[in-house]
A protein has these predicted regions:
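Glycine-centered flexibility motif
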Residues: 1, 58-60, 131, 135
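Glycine-centered recognition micro-motifs in short, flexible terminal segments and loops
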Residues: 1-14
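Sequence-level detector for tyrosine residue identity
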Residues: 3, 43, 52, 85-87, ...
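Periplasmic/extracellular, small/polar-rich flexible segments of pilin-like filament-forming proteins
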Residues: 64-141
Length: 141
């Protein structure tokens, strides 16, 4: 009986153990997503600083060269009706990372049927510009 319990216990430990390669891959992915979220927050902060000095622009795209840094792959902005939309393709875990970096901002959402939904799936009552595709992750300001 004792050996049976011991074998069940050891079997459970072996079954629930995650290999070191999986842990490393998960940590790398989390680090990449966190870095992407940090870049996104910096990007929108630079846009806000730029808009403070250029209040006349209410619509269009602000070129990344205006911020003095090189473009980030798949990270875009568009101004519409004096509102900034920073958007990028969503990927698993990116919304959580962006929420963590933005201190759980209510201005982070995902585009579904041209509407912006928050992290709980609630409609934020915002129609997004035509250039933002469904499934994109948006940081609104």
């Amino acid at each position: 009986m004792v050996y049976w319990l011991l074998s069940v216990f050891i079997g459970f430990l072996v079954w629930s153990n995650i290999s070191p390669h999986d842990q490393t891959g998960t940590q790398l992915q989390d680090s990449t997503l966190s870095q992407r979220a940090i870049q996104t927050v910096r990007y929108i902060n630079n846009i806000n600083d730029w808009r403070y000095n250029n209040p006349s622009q209410k619509d269009g795209v602000i070129p990344d060269s205006a911020f003095g840094w090189s473009s980030l792959p798949a990270l875009h902005n568009v101004l519409q009706a004096d509102r900034v939309y920073v958007y990028q393709p969503d990927q698993p875990g990116l919304m959580s990372a962006l929420l963590a970096q933005s201190r759980h901002s209510a201005l982070v959402g995902k585009v579904v049927a041209r509407r912006l939904l928050d992290s709980f799936g609630n409609d934020m009552q915002v129609n997004v510009p035509d250039s933002i595709t469904d499934g994109s992750l948006v940081y609104l300001n």
